[in-house]
């Protein structure tokens, strides 16, 4: 394979991994422990 192809595959995999981890953090089981600043400061 060419070097450019390997770099594109690596960067795409990295971005996909970061996106998947962000979604898991936002909506996964650990999301119950996240605080909601809007609920803390209701007027």
UniProtKB/Swiss-Prot annotation:
Coarse class of the protein's main subcellular location: plastid
UniProt entry tagged with the keyword Ribosomal protein: no
TM ranges: 4-24
Keywords carried by this UniProt record: Chloroplast, Membrane, Plastid, Thylakoid, Transmembrane, Transmembrane helix
Any single Pfam family the record assigns to this protein: PsbN
Localization, UniProt: Plastid, Chloroplast thylakoid membrane
InterPro entries per record: PSII_PsbN (IPR003398)
This protein's GO CC annotations: chloroplast thylakoid membrane
GO biological process, one term: photosynthesis
Topological type in the membrane: Single-pass membrane protein
This protein's record includes keyword Iron: no
Family membership: Belongs to the PsbN family.
Function: May play a role in photosystem I and II biogenesis.
UniProt-listed HAMAP family: PSII_PsbN
Protein known as: Protein PsbN
Higher taxonomy: Eukaryota, Sar, Stramenopiles, Ochrophyta, Bacillariophyta
Gene: psbN
């Amino acid at each position: 394979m060419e070097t450019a192809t390997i770099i594109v595959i690596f960067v795409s995999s990295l971005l996909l991994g970061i996106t998947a981890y962000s979604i898991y953090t936002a909506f996964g089981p650990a999301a119950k422990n996240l605080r909601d600043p809007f609920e803390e400061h209701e007027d």
